[in-house]
């Protein structure tokens, strides 16, 4: 059965609008755990636009479940991750001008670099993942890197302008899940998933985790963080294993 990992970046986005201390993404993460989330994910960006270094430290010290750290493949971020020791590191592309991560990491052509980059994490027991498109070339390259997981980008599916394109994107993701599994990779899905479109993956085997943030934070503004997380947990818990 897939599990829910909650991204609390946008709680930090709201906090940073006033450069204040609230709302606190660490508190939100604890509430998510109490509501049934099986892990927390944060993206420590190079420009520190939402999550801050202190947030990562506090989350690592206080979470009862798991911390997944999204980050760019830079020397600075590698040092932070090796010091904090999250349960998983997920490498993502990063552009300063983007509002949110716009697409998957290009792995093909960078296999040697990424192999060397993730090696120190494996040596101390940190799981590794690459946020990639559901493209066969990228999935095969990810397998050559030797990561334990891939997270397939669902943003193009979520943003599809019509039913035909949405089906095309879903079919590509489902095929990508199958290919990744045959290559020995564990598969997570994330980006743009919400309380409605997640049902398109209800009967798809082989999904380990759904990484969901924005839609949960959006609902939480109206219903509270605990109920918003619980609603998503209840949906995912109905999915077959």
UniProtKB/Swiss-Prot annotation:
GO terms for biological process: pyridoxine biosynthetic process. PANTHER family: PYRIDOXINE 5'-PHOSPHATE SYNTHASE (PTHR30456:SF0). The gene is pdxJ. Its EC number is 2.6.99.2. It catalyses: 3-amino-2-oxopropyl phosphate + 1-deoxy-D-xylulose 5-phosphate = pyridoxine 5'-phosphate + phosphate + 2 H2O + H(+). The keyword Cytoplasm applies. This is Pyridoxine 5'-phosphate synthase. 1-deoxy-D-xylulose 5-phosphate binds at residues 9-10, 45, 50, 100.
């Amino acid at each position: 059965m897939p599990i829910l990992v909650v991204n609390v970046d946008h709680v930090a986005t709201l906090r940073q609008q006033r450069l204040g201390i609230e709302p606190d993404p660490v508190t939100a993460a604890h509430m998510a755990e109490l509501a049934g989330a099986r892990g927390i994910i944060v993206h420590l960006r190079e420009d520190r636009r939402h999550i801050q270094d202190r947030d990562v430290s506090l989350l690592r010290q206080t979470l009862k479940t798991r911390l997944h750290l999204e980050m760019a493949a830079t020397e600075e971020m590698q040092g932070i991750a090796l010091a904090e020791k999250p349960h998983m590191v997920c490498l993502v592309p990063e552009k300063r001008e983007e509002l949110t991560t716009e697409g998957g990491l290009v792995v093909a052509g960078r296999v040697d670099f990424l192999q060397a980059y993730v090696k120190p994490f494996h040596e101390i027991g940190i799981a590794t993942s690459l946020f990639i498109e559901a493209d066969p070339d990228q999935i095969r390259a990810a397998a050559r890197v030797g990561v334990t997981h891939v997270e397939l980008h669902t943003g193009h599916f979520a943003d599809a302008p019509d039913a035909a394109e949405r089906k095309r994107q879903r079919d590509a993701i489902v095929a990508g899940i199958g290919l990744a599994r045959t290559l020995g990779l564990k598969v997570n899905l994330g980006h743009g998933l919400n309380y409605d479109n997640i049902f398109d993956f209800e009967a798809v085997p082989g999904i380990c985790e759904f990484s969901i943030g924005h839609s949960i934070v959006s609902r939480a503004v109206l219903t509270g963080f605990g109920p918003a997380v619980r609603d998503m947990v209840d949906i995912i818990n109905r999915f077959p294993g």
